[in-house]
Structures are given as structure tokens and as C-alpha cells.
Amino acid sequence: MAKVSPLRIDTELGKLPLKDKGLEMVEFESPEELRRNQLEKLVAGFRLFSYFGYDEGVAGHITFRDPEFNDHFWVNPLGVHFSQIKISDLLLVNHDGEVVQGDRPVNVAAFAIHSRLHKARPDVNAAAHSHSMYGRTFSSLGKLLDPITQDSCAFYERQSIYDHFSGVVEETEEGDRIANALGDKQVIILKNHGILTTGSS
């Protein structure tokens, strides 16, 4: 019978790589570098929304506030499916509705909602609105998500309802009403319409 020596395994991990590098924030040397990074993330967001089925035709919009010009935001153009959006498709729009960069038409509803939301909430750098099948279905109930599952608990005291939906949003006054109904929350359920979420990044 062979003699077996006990193994000695070093269990001292020392500093984990996560503590050394994983939590460092990337520093950008210019607003242009930061903008490019955010545009890449915005396009990735559209692609992910499409991949997970949060899109419906060409409806819905995701925006982010420009890092240099705070009264401007980037948005998807009218008529391009989320799965097809490229950086070159994105539009830079000011709060007056003027397309400052890009050569496609802006979605009127996207402008009406997001321009007022970004104006009312300086802490919101990004906002996403979709007509996902389940989000739209749930929105027809006109109620908040109950904190009954681990997933829905993430929305506890962070959501509100807008129950005055009257069709496609075409006026900034309705955008003002949506921003007002959102208040200081992160998510608003647009009754019979869909979901709108906000964030700092």
C-alpha cells in the first residue's frame, strides 16, 4: 500500500482581485471619451432590450443625458428597431426639440416624455420606456408591483403610477404630467401603456 502524505493547501487568499481592480471607476480624459463610452452602452442597452423581448416593433425609447451639454440628451430615432440601432443612428436633441446631431427624425413621443423628465430630474441621466408585452399587460391593472417576490422587492417604494394615458404622447404638457407623477421615484407604470424606468447611469 502506498504511503499518502497529507496535502498542505494554502488557503490564504490575500487581496482578492475584485478589491484591487474590480471596483475602480474608469476615468475619462475628456467629455468626448465619456460620451463615446455612454453611446456604446446606450446601443448595448437597445440590443439587450431587443434580445430579451422588451421591444414592440419600433415603439419605445431609451435616452441618456449628454455628459457635457446637460440640457441635451441622446435618443434613438423614429423607425429603427432596437436590434438594429448603431451609434451613428442616435440623435442628440436639446430641450427645445431640435436635433443637434443626427440626420433622422426624432420620435415625437420620445421627445415629449424624455425632454420633460430630464428637465425635471437633474439626477436622472438615463431613462428607458418600452411597450414590453408583460409590462404593458401589467400596466393595464393600474396598480403598483406588490413586494411579493425577490424581484419585485427591488421596486418597493421606488415606483409610481401615471393613470391618465390618452394615446400616443405628443405634447410636452403630458411629458410634464408624467415627470410630475414620477416624482422622486425611479420607475413609473404608465397605465395601459407600458413602463418607464430611470437611473443615474
Where do the language-model regions lie?
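Glycine-rich flexible loops
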Residues: 2-201
